[in-house]
Amino acid sequence: MRDLEIRGAGNVLGPEQSGHMMSVGYDLYLKLLEEAVQEEKGETPKPRVDCAAELLISANLPADYVADAGQRVDLYRRIALIRTDEQRSDMLDELIDRFGEPPAEAIALLDIALLRAKASEQGIAEIKQQDGRLLLTFSETDFARLSSLCGDSEFKGRLLLNAGSTPYLSLRLNKGEKAMEMAQTLVDKYAATAK
């Protein structure tokens, strides 16, 4: 994949394909390419849900950590593309190699990027911290999976399903619990209900 990023894809799907990568950007190009390949195989591309995460934590690349604004923009773009634990780990290694030990805000940025990716895969449209609670809103509601999650002993008595016009889960945070860690736990446990 890195070779493709460096050298370019060339004429992958036909004579008119060459040269379009530069006009749409590499990331969008890969997405369009993946959709075209799925279409050629007769598969229906799964619509991607982009999860919004609003947690009350500081998550950024401080200017005193990455001084060059252009490098920061590039890193923000690349961090937003994190989809797996391995990609998060690789990005953390790169930050350490290039800029030294990252501050807590940079670690939080990596964690949020991975959380958003995992939540998006599960159809979670939004994760929000509000009034001592975590609220999870879903693009599609699977009541069997949500009921299974609500029955988890770790959340007993504090995870509620609001089945209104826009169903959502509400988890009351206990004193001392970190919203980020609990959001990760909720998303991981919700993913496990699909298996």
Model features per residue range: what roles?
Residues 1-195:
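Accessory helical-bundle/CTD segments and flexible terminal tails appended to RecA-like ATPase motors
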